[in-house]
Each structure stands twice: as C-alpha cells, then as structure tokens.
Amino acid sequence: MASSTPSSSATSSNAGADPNTTNLRPTTYDTWCGVAHGCTRKLGLKICGFLQRTNSLEEKSRLVSAFKERQSSKNLLSCENSDKDGRFRRTETDFSNLFARDLLPAKNGEEQTVQFLLEVVDILLNYVRKTFDRSTKVLDFHHPHQLLEGMEGFNLELSDHPESLEQILVDCRDTLKYGVRTGHPRFFNQLSTGLDIIGLAGEWLTSTANTNMFTYEIAPVFVLMEQITLKKMREIVGWSSKDGDGIFSPGGAISNMYSIMAARFKYFPEVKTKGMAAVPKLVLFTSEHSHYSIKKAGAALGFGTDNVILIKCNERGKIIPADLETKILEAKQKGYVPLYVNATAGTTVYGAFDPIQEIADICEKYNLWLHVDAAWGGGLLMSQKHRHKLSGIERANSVTWNPHKMMGVLLQCSAILVKEKGILQGCNQMCAGYLFQPDKQYDVSYDTGDKAIQCGRHVDIFKFWLMWKAKGTVGFENQINKCLELAEYLYAKIKNREEFEMVFDGEPEHTNVCFWYIPQSLRGVPDSPERREKLHRVAPKIKALMMESGTTMVGYQPQGDKANFFRMVISNPAATQSDIDFLIEEIERLGQDL
C-alpha cells in the first residue's frame, strides 16, 4: 500500500511514536479508507469493516458508501484500473521500431511487453464485441487464391527476417477479420458454435500457463480438475462414483478410437505386445448414420474398413436392433469374432438417438463391448427434460462426450469415459522413465498421462471446469433446453409451408432440423429423377450466395439417396427466435430466383 502523510494534529499526538513507523500508519478513518479504495473490492471492504468496529453507525455507513461508490465508478475493463502504480496503463507506443526481441525476457522489456499485450487485448475485445453484434457479418468471404495472393497488406508468406510488432498487430487483426465468427448468433454451420466469455478467460489463462497434462508434477491443479470433472461426468452418465476412468482427448474422433482400443485390450490384452496377428479376425458394428470416425479408427487400428460393419437405420436415422443381431450372427457364421458395437446418441446429420437399451441387451447376449458415441448428444444428460433420450447409456462400457458441442465449451474439449478402471492405463501405459518415475514424493497415481496415446497433451479442462463453476449444472441445463426449444420453434415455423419440405416426418429429437428449400420453379412438380437432380443443386447455390453475402451460415449435405438438404443445428446460447426468423427469410431471399 502507498504510504499516507499524517495530518499535523496526528503528528503532534504521536510525538512519542517510533519515527520509523509513524508515517507508515494512516491515522484517520478517511486516510485509511483512501487506502482501501486502492485495493481490490474484497480487501477494501475488509479494511472498511475493520475501521468500523469502533466507529459510529453514521460514520460506518459513510465509509462503506464512499468505498462502494468509488469502486462502482471504476471502469472494470480499464487498463488504468489493473495496477495502482500505473504499470499497466495504455501509452502511445511506436511499434514500427519494436520487434519480438524487445519483449520479455529481454532486459527492460516489461513496458514494451505490457503495451503490446494491451494492443492484443484491444483487438480481442473488439472482436468479441463484433461477434455478438448482429449488424456485423458472420464472415468476410474470400477465395483461397485471394488470401494466398495477399489482402491489403495481409501476407501469409513467412519471411527470413523479423517483422515489426506493428506488422504483427496488423496480422492479428487481419487473421480475425478474414476468419469466420463461429460465435456469431447467426452461425449455424457446425455442431460447435458460440463464444462463452468464461471459457474464453479460461483459455487465455491456460495458454499463459503453457503446461502439459502428463504428470501431476507439472500440472497439479489441472490434473486434479480433470479427475474431479471426469468423475462428475461419469456420475451423470449413471455409473458408480467409485469406479470408472476417463481422459480428455483432442476430439470426438480420438475419443471414439480410445473406446475401440479399450475394447480390444479388454478381450485380447496380448494385442498390445503381439499385434493384430495374434488375435482372431475381429469385427466392429456401427450404424450407417454414425460418425465416420468409427471407420477411420478401424483403418488406423488395423481392423480394416471392410471389418467395420454398417447396421441399417430406420427413416429417422436410428439403428434397427434386429439388423444388428442379424449381422452379428452372420459374422460369427463366417468365422469372424464380433468385438464392439457403437451406438450413437445424437447423429451428426439427423440428430438421432439409437435405442441404447435394446442394443445393450444384444451386446450382453453376445458379450460385446458397447460404446455410446454421445459426442453431440451427451450434453442432453444435463437436462432433466431431455436426458431420457439417452436411456440405457449407463449400461455402456464406454462413452464419448464432447462438451465443446452442446455445452458450448470452446474447442477443443472431448472426453472418453470408461466404466472399468484400469483399462486405459493397461492399454496405453509405456512407463517412460523420464516422466513416470515410481519413486516421486507424491502419490503417482495422479500421473495420468500414461493413459493417453499422446505424450504432449493440451490442457482442455480449465475452461470447462471454470464454465461449470460459473454456470452450475443448472446453468448448462437451461442453456441446452433453450437450444432445443429453438429447434422446435424452427420446425413448427416451416413444417407446413410450401416453400419448405422436411427430410423426415416428426419433431426433431435434437437441435438438428433437416429440410429442403423448394424454389418457386419446383413447387408442385411431381417427384422424378429430374426434379431430384434440380433440387440437389439448390442448397449448394444458396449456401454459396449465403457465404458471399456473409449474413449467416448453415450446413447442407446429402444422405443416402436423398438430394442435398439443409441441416440446421443450434448449440449457440446467444441465438434467439429472431435469428431463426432471419435464417428462414435469408434462405427465401437468396433462393427466390433459382
């Protein structure tokens, strides 16, 4: 705290005091309250509270009111407020003559570092503000060749010699300028959308810490956060809090791959040392609507894509259990060994939920590993209203759950949850002596890195943990319920309009709403190969116009023999009914002349 100069009366009354300490002690309530005003709100209130113990009620009220008024008058985002000695105040700085070598750890580099980072924060805050501003574009689209050739001083080529910090700041601005604002309320293109401010703060701090998740030794708090959060997620799935395991991975595709590795190790542990040649010819089962990562994992892990058997789905995209059992029996008759079934809770395109209870019955009957890919639908477990759609998930051996989708956590944040403790460790452990020494001074069971197939592992947990603390489980529940309500609103708005046609009948189970826009030229035209071919070209044309205008973004795709259709997904808590209305109007505007 800064020292205060006592008044003359105070000086006379302290004539016999120690001259080395007298001037360090403010002697009036006003002086002390001035000191309190320079502190954080929490500490300042404590100081004021201490002063009030022997003061009158009138004086107490005056002191606290003065402190609160002073605190509330401060601009919380002001750099002038961050340090009372002014080190973090913005000053005019000529960055054209400054380079990376002038920043910390350079000698006398603190001031330049502060000014540079304040400029970066200014860029970031402007971007955040514009992201939530509906009058701004979702994207400023340019073709690859335009960006590669350079845009108004924005050059992607790397140079041999250092460029000034002024140019680096320009590059920071332009990188955001020409990117896509995935947090914009009218961005509906992917399953991962939104820009959560608490999560953003967590990611800033994560990058600043710049640590690795392989041992407690170098990431003590993050390792404990991960264990606590994974335990909570397993409980929400419906497993015993004492059992189970899990780890955060780079994404749902890797989490799904972990599940196949765990299943293979559980039934055939010798594969770890002897390879696939030592085990029978194994087959995996997944639905024809499941995520392509199951086939990709089959290829990467040595099963081969021919041994990833696709199960038929009904018109809503759900696995037909009878076809699963038929294909299991067919595989056994051909000499294959069925190993693993993947059920999807929230398919990528239709948002369908496979009948997990019936699939679990079949897996138990034939002793197969059941995995539930709830990358997209796992968030619904947080909702008392919607979690019934994942009924039976507690019977799974493993679950993929991506908080970076429905829960709005910033990319990347995916978890693989395993019901049986020890399988991930046994499957992946290599006991690298330079990392996982058994004779450390702490409990080495907290060195979780050997469960992962990676060595270096990004800290994905902090932003998620911080968001959960800020929102609570109830906050996530409300957020998810709102997104599903918006999907119901969209469905109700277009289902009976002649310019739209639903891909399948019935209300959506998830926030996926799949539909065709029918231009005037195709309305009332009977179904035929020619009409389907023309309809197939409608969605891509509208999407191209949409991107050129930059007003909104929504995805499209074919499915089976169906022509290209729009797949609307809602996972951004910032979206409202007005944004849904805008999307419909924009599709009509862009498609009216097709």
Swiss-Prot record:
Essential cofactor(s): pyridoxal 5'-phosphate
Phosphoserine, modified sites: 78
Gene3D superfamilies: 3.90.1150.170, Type I PLP-dependent aspartate aminotransferase-like (Major domain)
Residue positions where N6-(pyridoxal phosphate)lysine is found in the record: 405
An annotated Gene Ontology molecular function: glutamate decarboxylase activity
Region (Disordered): 1-23
Annotated EC: 4.1.1.15
Gene Ontology cellular component terms for the protein in this record: cytoplasm; presynaptic active zone
Biological role stated in the UniProt entry: Catalyzes the synthesis of the inhibitory neurotransmitter gamma-aminobutyric acid (GABA) with pyridoxal 5'-phosphate as cofactor.
Protein name in UniProt: Glutamate decarboxylase 1
Native species: Bos taurus (Bovine)
